[in-house]
Curated annotation (Swiss-Prot):
Organism this protein belongs to: Mycobacterium leprae (strain TN)
Residues annotated for ATP binding in this entry: T15, T16, S17, T274, G318, Q322, G419
MF GO annotations: ATP binding; glycerol kinase activity
Record GO biological process: glycerol catabolic process; glycerol metabolic process; glycerol-3-phosphate metabolic process
Binding site for glycerol: R85, E86, Y137, D252, Q253
The keyword Nucleotide-binding is annotated on this UniProt entry: yes
The entry's keywords: ATP-binding, Glycerol metabolism, Kinase, Nucleotide-binding, Transferase
UniProt protein name: Glycerol kinase
Pathway in which the depicted protein is active: Polyol metabolism; glycerol degradation via glycerol kinase pathway; sn-glycerol 3-phosphate from glycerol: step 1/1
Length: 508
């Protein structure tokens, strides 16, 4: 750690934007800079990002936040990275040029690959070894698609010229030199989202690679989330302007777990973003799900044993509110969803299931599509706004119930973070739907904070978990107001609505 370095920098490379946040010893945000990037939608179901644009945005936010605070590399003890998971990039080792756009986690072009895996029995092997169901969500199928459909990638992959990575790997490679010797590495949390890593061995699995015809030569090394030795060091002529060790990498939802200090078995958090991601810490135990959840690595610090988690991934939550704004035009901004929904006392019998790209946890139905059910002439825009907020909360209830069935753990409190947590009505509905207290922390940027914690622990900026727990502070708490009968009746309506969305698209 630099002698007078008083800060940790964290890069948060997300689905819609990239930000850099500076934190102090108290885990308090000192400064941030954020830039959005283009969402490329070539055809229905396809979602892409430009890797070069993402790298340029990352470099820009790094330089901007340092300039705005008059800080330099010598003030930064370490750099952490957190990122959108599963998004798949392939680039040339010698030139640094991507072979194609990144295929984003939301992209569904690989639906037939996923169906074929389940049909011939390979899906059960993937579930057993990787902890994941075959789905369009994960990187393995996306990488197979690139190898099969992008000219030149297959041959380049065989001879080691083509490199695969999720956004963390792409940023690490560029920050540490790119074609001039950049490191090609990922962490265990990101690797656990590919369908290619054995959860127990924490290494790429040859049988899983064979399912997707992926050459091992193109894969990054797998390291701890907070390794004993840095992943690498930023270059003096790079965007940081000096040498700073990169010592923490976590997929975004794993980073939020660390940022929320959910470090003990039985603790859970729910992140509300484009989608929702609810994780339950299961300690050193690998809990296999029989109820549609994912088994994943939560984090690994140093050379300690990894900590695992159960995860419920929900594809469409915050983006459903964006749909009200951008496609229907019934609100002018996300904040208006609350004021509009408050014009009614309930949903008026309306349920909205936003299965725009199918349903993720716990259903895993790529054949589902969105539906608004229960409409009558009595209903208004306000009922639809209310139903949209409720859909976010009911989908989370689906996951919480599945977690209880898999783990035997029933929550008594749920920590929450993400943009929608500023919507008081939505958080009150969440407490009512779950029947447990919902708690928001003071620091809103828990994802960036988690990667900062991972980086800081590696260099002694924080001594250990007790320091992180001391930093966590409650900002607001919502307590349930519904009775059990109301809760049960409302949720039964939701489950009925979900059934109406199934078998809509032929993915056979």
């Amino acid at each position: 750690m630099a002698e007078f370095a008083e800060f940790i920098a964290a890069i948060d490379q997300g689905t819609t934007s990239t930000r850099c946040v500076i934190f102090d010893h108290n885990g308090a945000e000192v400064a941030r800079h954020q830039l959005e990037h283009e969402q490329i939608l070539p055809r229905s179901g396809w979602v892409e990002h430009n890797p070069v644009e993402i790298w340029e945005r990352t470099a820009s936010v790094l330089m901007s936040v340092l300039n705005a605070t008059n800080l330099s590399a010598k003030d930064i003890a370490a750099l952490g990275i957190t990122n959108q998971r599963e998004t798949t990039l392939v680039w040339n080792r010698n030139t640094g040029r991507p072979y194609c756009n990144a295929i984003v986690w939301q992209d569904t072009r690989t639906d037939r690959i996923a169906v074929a895996l389940d049909r011939d029995g390979r899906g059960e092997v993937i579930r057993r070894k990787a902890g994941l169901p075959p789905a369009t969500y994960f990187s393995g199928g996306k990488l197979q698609w690139i190898l099969e459909n992008v000219d030149g990638v297959g041959a380049a992959a065989e001879n080691g010229e083509a490199l695969f990575g999720t956004p963390d790997t792409w940023l690490l490679w560029n920050l540490t030199g790119g074609p001039r010797g950049g490191v090609h590495v990922t962490d265990v949390t990101n690797a656990s989202r590919t369908m290619l890593m054995d959860l127990e061995k924490l290494d790429w699995d040859d049988e899983l690679l064979s399912f997707f015809s992926i050459p091992r030569a193109m894969l990054p090394a797998i390291a701890s989330s907070s390794p004993l030795q840095p992943y690498g060091v930023t270059l003096a002529d790079g965007p940081v302007g000096g040498e700073v060790p990169i010592t923490g990498v976590l997929g975004d939802q794993h980073a939020a777990m660390v940022g929320q200090v959910c470090l003990d078995a039985g603790e859970a958090k729910n992140t509300y973003g484009t989608g929702n991601f609810l994780l339950l810490n299961t300690g050193e135990a690998i809990v296999r799900s029989g109820n549609g959840l994912l088994t994943t690595v939560c984090y690994q610090f140093g050379d300690a044993k990894p900590v695992y988690a159960l995860e419920g991934s929900i594809a469409v939550t915050g983006s459903a509110v964006q749909w009200l704004r951008d496609q229907l035009g019934i609100i002018s901004g996300a904040a208006q969803s609350e004021s509009l929904a408050r014009q009614v006392v309930d949903n008026g019998g309306v349920y909205f299931v936003p299965a725009f790209s199918g349903l993720f946890s716990p259903y895993w139905r790529s054949d589902a599509r969105g539906a608004i059910v229960g409409l009558s002439r009595f209903n208004t825009n306000a009922h639809l706004a209310r139903a949209t907020l409720e859909a976010i909360c009911y989908q989370s209830r689906d996951v919480v119930d599945a977690m209880a069935a898999d783990s035997g753990v029933r929550l008594d409190v749920l920590k929450v973070d993400g943009g929608i947590t500023s919507n008081d009505l939505c958080m009150q509905i969440q407490a009512d739907v779950l029947g447990v207290d919902v708690v928001r922390s003071v620091v809103a940027e828990t994802t960036a904070l988690g990667s900062a914690y991972a980086a800081g622990l590696a260099v002694g900026f924080w001594a250990g978990p007790s320091d992180l727990r001391a930093n966590w502070q409650e900002d607001k708490r919502w307590t349930p107001t519904w009775g059990e009968d109301q809760r049960a009746a409302a949720y039964a309506g939701w489950r009925k609505a979900v059934q109406r969305t199934l078998d809509w698209v032929d993915v056979s």
